[in-house]
């Protein structure tokens, strides 16, 4: 349970940092696709985070997989999402696909790496 809590906190902090860093880029991207600004809905956002953190915990952290495997899982999840957008939305860019897929890998890998370090410190 400690692993799950630590990984969830790290995951949300890292993703929040990334979102703030790249916010303007994604605001432009979303505006090109839907013709209006981002309209974040909190409940679906929270559900998304629950699923992503569960996937990370279930497939990586609980099985003591390394950060490289976590990177591949995160990259794959985000790449599927981004290539789906790229296939469906005329104005979705390949650059967005690449940036976000790489971020998914970094997010999963770094969360795993930091969770492993912090879990050892708290035991």
Regions inferred by a protein language model and the residue ranges of each:
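Juxtamembrane/disordered regions of integral membrane proteins
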Residues: 1-123
């Amino acid at each position: 349970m400690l692993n799950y809590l630590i990984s969830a906190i790290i995951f949300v902090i890292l993703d929040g940092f990334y979102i703030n860093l790249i916010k303007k880029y994604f605001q432009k991207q979303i505006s090109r696709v839907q013709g209006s600004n981002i309209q974040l809905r909190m409940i679906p956002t929270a559900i998304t985070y629950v699923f992503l953190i569960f996937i990370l915990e279930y497939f990586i952290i609980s099985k003591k997989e390394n950060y490289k495997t976590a990177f591949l899982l995160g990259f794959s999840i985000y790449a599927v999402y981004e290539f789906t957008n790229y296939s469906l939305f005329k104005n979705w860019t390949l650059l967005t696909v690449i940036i976000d897929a790489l971020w998914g890998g970094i997010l999963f890998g770094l969360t795993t790496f930091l969770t492993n370090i912090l879990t050892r410190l708290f035991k």
